[in-house]
């Protein structure tokens, strides 16, 4: 058991090192995309399933409340938090539309959709991205594995942050770290003189 525990930590560290080498440009582009949208008076919509939903909620909460320092609230909405809306849509046998309907209702040109999917193949996330494209929104996608169907939907203005791993647990860990990096970069760019 001790060796398995050490192996989990070692694999996580190795994934972090690989991501630190591969992802700074994509994370920087994503952060600047989010910052520019906020500066233009737009908002960020976030979605994911399971652990990815938790990461989406963490991002939205960090924008609305704060990340590490006090600052004005920033507009972000986690689309997975309204159980009445989610179950109403799903009850009509539209499980794949639970996020897309919200994107079509709430999203506007200039807004950003932060779409989080470990494999990039979740139908409801894919449909949300398709809806965001019709609303002239920009997409920041956090993925893993080969990026899945989600990667193929992204245009040149969009940003994919693909974790270099084929293990769901490692990808989800890195998605949380990436969300924290994005929050830090947004705060540091918009409020550079705030102390941690």
Curated annotation (Swiss-Prot):
Secretion signal span: none
Record SUPFAM superfamilies: SIS domain
Q: Which domain of life is it from?
A: Bacteria
A molecular function annotated in GO for this UniProt entry is: carbohydrate derivative binding
Q: Which keywords annotate this record?
A: DNA replication
Query: How does this protein assemble?
Result: Homotetramer; dimer of dimers.
Query: What's this protein's family per the entry?
Result: Belongs to the SIS family. DiaA subfamily.
Entry protein name: DnaA initiator-associating protein DiaA
Which species is this UniProt entry from?
A: Escherichia coli O1:K1 / APEC
